[in-house]
Amino acid sequence: MYPDNRRYSREHEWVLIESDGRALVGITDYAQEQLGDVVFVELPEAGTQLDQSQKMGEVESVKAVSDLFTPLTGEVAEVNQALVDHPELINDDPHDKGWMVRLASVDATQLDSLLSASEYESFLAELG
Amino acid sequence: MSQSMSRTALYDTHLSLGGRMVPFAGWEMPLQFQGILAETRAVRAHSGLFDVSHMGRIWVRGRQASALLDWTATGNISGLTQGRARYGLLCTHEGGILDDGIVYYLGPEEYLLVCNASNRDAVWRWLAELRDSRFQDTELDDRTMEVGMIAFQGPDAHAVMERLSPDLPGSLRPFRCASIQVDGVTVLIARTGYTGEDGFELMPPADASADIWKRLLETGAVPCGLGARDVLRLEAGLLLHGTDMNIRTNPYEAGLDRFVALEKESVYAAALRQVASQGVGRKLTGFRMLERGVPRHGYTILQDNLEVGEVTSGGYSPTLDSYIGLGYVAMELTAPGSRFVVDIRGRQTEAEAVALPFYSRRRG
């Protein structure tokens, strides 16, 4: 069920490399399901330099606060402003409209450290 | 889950409905079914069902039953007429709040106290101590495990109950209770709740709970978990014991002094008369965030970089589409419109005191 056009982290983020080489980042369907209703998102400002696995923001559900990590090194080119007013997009459409940041100047070699869709699904199966 | 966790008679029902079970006050309870916000909206718009069988149900019977309850419950219990219920606090000799709950006057020399699950043991010990020391002609009977409890809440609840039970007294107004038949089962029913909506709390025998629950589900009521219950009670400005008040808080600080009868003889009278005459230095206030951010229990409230209080409850209100909270602040900051800042994990976020409740239903 996880799209195989992208890579996944063990922290439940996905990253999709776009045709221009930039990277779209969001959280997985599993992550949004675990969180429950998302009511607040804090995302980095455009221009922020991030290193792989660095904390880039927070997502809050009704019951809990969770940190967001970037799966790749890069520079924040754009954030999804729609999430500020409509954090529920993360629950409704985590793999598309619920995207969080667009990264430029990414290091594509780091993709190898991430999981494929089938590897991520196996990882989820191990979590139970 | 450890083996010491209790399960309500509806445990299997919750699993079959996809309930996400969590430990709560020694019980395995559903946190949510379809989702906390959707469940909250369903209760405001139509109706929802909550398993509240984990709450303590202690019968108090005998010649001194009302005297015992009057000694510690802040409401005027001996002034109740049969078939009525009263919200109140159980206060100690120091005026601290041991628990809050509802006392139902069921019949001659027979009362029911419904208390919080987390305080059930402490309440039992306290009542037993009062019985042994002053009110020996009283029988205490904890029937939490034998009697179930289902809250059926929302604007549709009344019409549905009238249809399900033709003998539901038309006069069963808020804070009234009665014994009715539902599908041949005798159910204690009260027009009470913890959501800010119209609704009922039904107490069938535990082994009939699942059938009553199923019957109510068939009417279109949405199964709801503890998550929605917490959002609903916060929107309605209802405090949660252990979170918004505790044994070190008195009813005047908690803004619950309207539920305190001071004139009667009681264990708390001397302490609370003194509080009433001296006033309090801090008080619970409602507030709403002026910027986006989720206030949560334990966050510091600041003004001019000085600590002036602490958040006790908070969250996103789907009904109001804003972020709201409860907290204790210095007395002068409780006036509606007062500005302060909530420290949300290092982010200073503007807030404004507002009058409670945040939400009140249209009555008609």
Predicted regions and their residues:
Chain A
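Acidic, low-complexity mobile loops and tails
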Residues: 1-55, 93-128
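Periplasm/extracytoplasmic soluble domains of Gram-negative envelope assemblies
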Residues: 21, 62-64, 72
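A short beta-loop-beta micro-motif enriched in histidine and acidic residues
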Residues: 36-38, 62-65
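Short, conserved catalytic or interaction motifs in soluble domains
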Residues: 61, 81
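Histidine- and aromatic-rich ligand-binding microenvironments
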Residues: 67-71, 104
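Basic, polyanion-binding surface patches
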Residues: 86
